């Protein structure tokens, strides 16, 4: 009898590495995995409305914790980490040292993802709050100018086969985009002229990714969740630039 595919919902930033991990898991166990990717907050809303996810890998811990608090999902486990980087156009002369000046420059278009819908947007606003501790008035300026270009329910989708952030930057929608370092690395591979700038320590924001399994899901759900914490999957995540839990 053919096993039903395991329904795994995962943050968009996990697309490449989860596709690889799922393929390996299927080859090893025979368990088919159906992957659904998107902004974590939007996925959480879809799950709350009754979609059939059995494993949820979020780019934060708050969204899976909300599901757990409602009772139908297990408390989340942090399974991997990420951090914010600045993805910039070739002509932007940004360095870690002058990044805040660059972000505050009125002539620089600053792109982010959408807070609440996508944790990447929430992390950008956390960076803005840190900027306020470095320079008075920075939060208000950044909050006012930031363009929420991705991750929302109505955000334009890139053409098939294109990465969201590389496409947004190639279209010239932003001069600087605050996104996960893993996304920035992938975007640079797609559009080599783009530059990746590390965020200085005073502004750095870490992202803890939470993993949860639906209560009553088949045993294969817990098996896959445990596999994500095991050395082979952790090595794959590290290859894509993610940090250890």
Residues covered by each model-derived region:
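Exported/periplasmic ABC-transporter solute-binding proteins
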Residues: 1-36, 40-51, 58-61, 65-69, ...
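Periplasmic N-terminal soluble interaction domains immediately after the signal peptide in Gram-negative
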Residues: 74-75
């Amino acid at each position: 009898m053919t096993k039903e595919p395991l329904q795994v919902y995962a943050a968009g930033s996990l697309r490449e590495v989860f596709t690889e991990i799922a393929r390996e898991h299927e080859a090893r166990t025979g368990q088919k995995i159906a992957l659904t990717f998107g902004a974590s907050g939007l996925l959480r809303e879809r799950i709350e409305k009754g979609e059939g996810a059995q494993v949820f890998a979020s780019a934060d811990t708050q969204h899976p914790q909300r599901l757990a608090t409602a009772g139908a999902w297990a408390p989340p486990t942090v399974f991997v980490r990420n951090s914010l980087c600045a993805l910039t156009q070739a002509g932007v002369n940004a360095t870690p040292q002058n990044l805040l000046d660059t972000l505050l420059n009125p002539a620089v278009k600053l792109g982010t993802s959408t807070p609440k819908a996508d944790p990447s947007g929430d992390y950008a606003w956390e960076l803005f709050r840190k900027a306020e501790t470095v320079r008075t008035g920075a939060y208000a300026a950044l909050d006012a100018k930031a363009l929420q270009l991705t991750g929302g329910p109505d955000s334009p989708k890139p053409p098939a086969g294109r990465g969201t952030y590389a496409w947004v930057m190639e279209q010239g929608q932003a001069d600087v985009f605050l996104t996960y370092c893993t996304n920035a690395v992938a975007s640079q591979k797609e559009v080599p002229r783009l530059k990746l700038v590390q965020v200085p320590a005073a502004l750095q924001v870490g992202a803890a990714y939470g993993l949860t399994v639906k209560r009553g899901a088949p045993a294969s759900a817990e098996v896959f969740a445990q596999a994500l914490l095991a050395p082979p999957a952790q090595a794959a995540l590290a290859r894509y630039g993610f940090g250890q839990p």
